[in-house]
Amino acid sequence: MCNCGSSGEKPTFNDRKSTSYEHLFKYIMVGDSAVGKSNLLLQFVDKRFAPNSDFTIGVEFGSRSININDKQIKLQIWDTAGQEKFRSITRAYYRGAVCAMIVYDITRRDSFESLNSWLTDCRKFSSCDVTTVLIGNKADLEANRQVSTSEAKEFAEKNGLMFFETSAKTALNVDEAFEKSTEQILKKLESNPGLLSNEGNN
């Protein structure tokens, strides 16, 4: 794990290295503070949830290898801080990313209303071929929902995004979001072999 400018006790992520892999895909996770980005990463990489995790300061890193269509793919995932004061740091990590996950909290309307700003950054600072995924996190808190599934789905369709509602706590759709987006990247790679010319670079 790499912590850039971090302070305080943070969850640690295992780097599940395989002896070999066919591709290295760089992912970046963005979105407002406290929407659950760090716990999504923790759940995907370590299969656990940290209910009292601190806000991300700067950038955190985790990786995991998965098998898609008989291909071993290593995902290198960068979890970025959501605070405005770290926005310039976050923007630097779009470079070389083949997937951007934009995360909001289904129980916080304000985090959904920030999506246009995050999407603008994504389109400005990442490759035009980047696969973009909209993640509505904290789906386990249905009673506190402030953003309907249909509204989020409409936003995703309007902007050409993949869409999943997830729960980092229960693991709902966490693996699916990474696996399905990886499948989409592999499809793009078939028609554009140069897509990964900068794979894994910051």
Curated annotation (Swiss-Prot):
Protein name as annotated: Ras-related protein Rab-2B
Post-translational modification: This sequence lacks the C-terminal cysteine motifs subject to isoprenylation in other Rab proteins.
InterPro entries in alphabetical order: P-loop_NTPase (IPR027417), Rab_GTPases_membrane_traffic (IPR050209), Small_GTP-bd (IPR005225), Small_GTPase (IPR001806)
GO terms of molecular function: GTP binding; GTPase activity
Family matches, as NCBIfam families: small_GTP (TIGR00231)
Motif (Effector region): 53-61
Species the sequence originates in: Dictyostelium discoideum (Social amoeba)
Gene Ontology BP terms: hypotonic response; vesicle-mediated transport
A GO-annotated cellular component: pathogen-containing vacuole
Keyword set, alphabetical order: GTP-binding, Nucleotide-binding
PROSITE patterns to which the protein is assigned, alphabetical: RAB
Gene: rab2B
Family: Belongs to the small GTPase superfamily. Rab family.
